[in-house]
Amino acid sequence: MAAAAAAAAQRLLAASTKIIGVGRNYVAHAKELGNPVPKEPLLFLKPTSSFLHAGVAGAAIEVPGPVESLHHEVELAVVLSQRARDVPEASAMDFVGGYALALDMTAREFQSAAKSAGLPWTLCKAQDTFTPISAVIPKSAVANPNDLELWLKVDDELRQKGSTSDMIFKIPSLISYISSIMTLMEGDVILTGTPEGVGPVRPGQKIKAGITGLVDVEFDVQKRKRSFST
């Protein structure tokens, strides 16, 4: 039974059509970047081409040439089990198929420029390898997703440690709100926000991150090697 649930959970990501990010969903993180605390979820989209699956040989987070400040953001990812549209908050958890540990890699100087100009966050959030993600943890294996410890280290230095209990908007609220705006499909991923402690990584460094007691991942960071010459 457990093996079947695990196999079904892994298949969800293959069906994913989009990644929905939630910004500033932890008060301390909003404040550390000098941002106001939102009164409703702040959403942005990432393409599934930004996924970087943990455990794949040779997989590494790539720092594109123009990026000078690539930041790590550790997050709980929620993976949808079925199509969801206009879902009431009371039944929102029925649409969850599993969870994962994810990183929302962010080109911070691109984000700062976009915010100043009132532009979308595509350049800073959507590039290849900018959504490293673990295997999917079946919903049945997570007793309380609103009380999970997230952590992240860079070269064994602890950078981030926080609890999903500190999220401003909890999972049922996020699913209900997002599904009132856009239809969520089976396998779609919601990145629920990051606790404080975000910071830069450089080529040659190693990121380790996890959900305590459930999963941990490890990714090398390298400079992107383009497949064409100019």
UniProtKB/Swiss-Prot annotation:
Chain coiled-coil ranges: none
Keyword set includes Metal-binding: yes
EC number: 5.3.2.2
Chief localisation class: mitochondrion
Pfam families: FAA_hydrolase
InterPro entries referenced in this protein's UniProt entry, alphabetically: Fumarylacetoacetase-like_C (IPR011234), Fumarylacetoacetase_C_sf (IPR036663)
Function: Tautomerase that converts enol-oxaloacetate, a strong inhibitor of succinate dehydrogenase, to the physiological keto form of oxaloacetate.
Name the UniProt record assigns to this protein: Oxaloacetate tautomerase FAHD1, mitochondrial
